[in-house]
From Swiss-Prot:
The lineage of its organism: Eukaryota, Metazoa, Ecdysozoa, Arthropoda, Hexapoda. This is Gamma-aminobutyric acid receptor subunit beta. Residues 398-412 have a biased composition (Basic residues). One of its GO terms (cellular component) is synaptic vesicle membrane. Residues 491-501 have a biased composition (Gly residues). Keywords: Cell membrane, Chloride, Chloride channel, Disulfide bond, Glycoprotein, Ion channel, Ion transport, Ligand-gated ion channel, Membrane, Postsynaptic cell membrane, Receptor, Signal, Synapse, Transmembrane, Transmembrane helix, Transport.
Length: 576
């Protein structure tokens, strides 16, 4: 119904005033509804255009599935597919010497061309970015990590993967992975070592006739975040290479990304090197302690040895059981030898002191008995024959007849007398070189004066000076036998007041240490020419000097040998 007809109908049915009111209300309502209808028309037109765009993109994606077989690689039967690879390392979480592996989180991107996915270029749709669901509908390289031990694909909050399809058919696939890969390590210079760990990329089934891998951006294909850090290591740099691997099933293309790590020395200096060095220094304290303080020195030596043993055990417990020697083993082993040598040094000092003390006691006993014997002779009392095989030997001064003028004598060596079962006769006093020496007892006895340790015999020293008597035989000195007397008679040299033997033979009849007691006094406190105190004095200098020299050689050699940088390494922070 038109507006004029509606107006005529209302005019016939309603009064004129009311008719005008209704007409104005109707006109006003039409004016209000006009903008709304215009907006609805505009929205409808816009919606129609957007829908057209959706239809075009969907049509492109749907067209990929027409006569497309994802089981067949691109250019099947033709040239191999070139797959470009790039990596960007986000973080490296661990590097284990025990497990020989390392864990890293990185973006892994692959680039290849599939002509079957090319489409006509349209404005605004040169590249299509689609979700990970689309990957199930197309062919993708069967890439895997050769030295992978464990991998993790991130799915929070959605699958961390996307696909980009270029209108020319170029495909870009990007995923985020966390991989634990094996890393064989050489711990010969541990803890000053540098390790080179790598990730190897290869096709699992396609040989080089089907797929060839390459670094897509040349030397800049691998990137490492500057925020990568490890507690015990620093990332020195990385390098990349492409190789061809020959297996029984054919030749395969392989890419390798190598990352070099430098171990930080701070932990090992604080926890191992400095404590072990201080333990060695503590072991030197025993050199300044009195050698008679046996409990203190033994306790100190044993404690340092056990502490070094514990430190070595705890250090090696955190490392793999390897057969070769590490640099830290050299240091700890040397420290252990040093503290053990300190303990043996006190054992040597104690042994020498004991031997010297025993010699002093024997000398004092012999000297005391000799003085008693001389006193009896001065009193005119002739001692009865000694039933013991051991007899006493006296050192007298100038004497005449059987009388002696005793002089104080130092310690004399050990004397041993052995009997010879042939009669008895008393030796007379002999004045030799102005000194009197009387040996009272059976003449058929052998008197031995033990001066030095038996080991001195190997050095040409005099072990024993022997005065032999028997059958009138002369005393035997260091120069050979003296004059012989008749059997059963008095010894050569006369009776009670006879003259002594002349010349060198007279002095040879008596041991030299009896003629020169001062020399005996000088050497009685030494063993092998040194005293126990000398050993402590020498040790106070020798041990520190040896340890300082060892440290200088150790740190200079190992720091120089271990400072090796891999060839063609791109240092961290120098990537272009």
């Amino acid at each position: 119904m038109s507006d004029s007809m509606l107006y005529q109908t209302l005019q016939t049915c309603l009064p004129k005033s009311r008719l005008i009111t209704l007409w104005l209300a109707f006109t006003l309502a039409m004016l209000i509804q006009e903008p709304r209808r215009h907006a609805a028309t505009v929205n409808a037109a816009t919606a129609g255009g957007s829908m057209l765009g959706d239809v075009n993109i969907s049509a492109i994606l749907d067209s990929f599935s027409v006569s497309y077989d994802k089981r067949v690689r691109p250019n099947y039967g033709g040239p191999p597919v070139e797959v470009g690879v790039t990596m960007y390392v986000l973080s490296i979480s661990s590097l284990s010497e025990v497990k020989m592996d390392f864990t890293l989180d990185f973006y892994f991107r692959q680039f290849w061309t599939d002509p079957r996915l090319a489409y006509r270029k349209r404005p605004g749709v040169e590249t299509l970015s689609v979700g990970s669901e689309f990957i199930k509908n197309i062919w993708v390289p069967d890439t895997f990590f050769v030295n992978e031990k464990q991998s993790y694909f991130h799915i929070a909050t959605t699958s961390n993967e996307f696909i980009r399809v270029h209108h020319s058919g170029s495909i870009t696939r990007s995923i985020r992975l966390t991989i634990t890969a094996s890393c064989p390590m050489n711990l010969q210079y541990f803890p000053m070592d540098r390790q080179l760990c790598h990730i190897e990329i290869e096709s699992f089934g396609y040989t080089m006739r089907d797929i060839r891998y390459k670094w897509n951006e040349g030397p800049n294909s691998v990137g490492v975040s500057s925020e990568v850090s490890l507690p015990q290591f620093k990332v020195l740099g990385h390098r990349q290479r492409a190789v061809e691997i020959s297996l029984t099933t054919g030749n395969y293309s392989r890419l390798a990304c190598e990352i070099q790590f430098v171990r930080s020395m701070g932990y090992y200096l604080i926890q191992i090197y400095i404590p072990s060095g201080l333990i060695v220094v503590i072991s030197w304290v025993s050199f300044w302690l009195n050698r008679n303080a046996t409990p203190a020195r033994v306790a100190l030596g044993v404690t340092t040895v056990l502490t070094m043993t514990t430190l070595m055990s705890s250090t090696n417990a955190a490392l793999p059981k390897i057969s070769y020697v590490k640099s830290i083993d050299v240091y700890l082993g040397t420290c252990f030898v040093m503290v053990f040598a300190s303990l043996l040094e006190y054992a040597t000092v104690g042994y020498m002191a004991k031997r010297i003390q025993m010699r002093k006691q024997r000398f004092m006993t012999i000297q005391k008995m000799a003085e008693q014997k001389k006193q009896q002779q001065l009193d005119g009392v002739q001692p009865p024959p000694n039933p013991n095989p051991n007899t006493m030997v006296d050192h007298g001064g100038h004497g005449h007849g059987h009388g002696h003028h005793s002089h104080g004598h130092p310690h004399v060596p050990k004397q041993t007398v052995s009997n010879r079962p042939i009669g008895f006769q008393t030796m007379q006093q002999q004045n030799i070189g102005g000194r009197g020496c009387s040996i009272v007892g059976p003449l058929f006895q052998e008197v031995r004066f033990k001066v030095h340790d038996p080991k001195a015999h190997s050095k040409g020293g005099t072990l024993e000076n022997t005065v032999n008597g028997g059958r009138g035989g002369p005393p035997v000195g260091p120069h050979g036998p003296g004059p012989q007397g008749p059997p059963g008679g008095p010894p050569a040299g006369g009776g009670g007041g006879g003259a002594p033997p002349e010349g060198g033979d007279a002095e040879a009849a008596v041991p030299a240490h009896l003629l020169h007691p001062g020399k005996v006094k000088k050497d009685i406190n030494k063993l092998l020419g040194i005293t126990p105190s000398d050993i402590d004095k020498y040790s106070r200098i020798v041990f520190p000097v040896c340890f300082v020299c060892f440290n200088l050689m150790y740190w200079i050699i190992y720091l120089h040998v271990s400072d090796v940088v891999a060839d063609d390494l791109v240092l961290l922070g120098e990537e272009k």
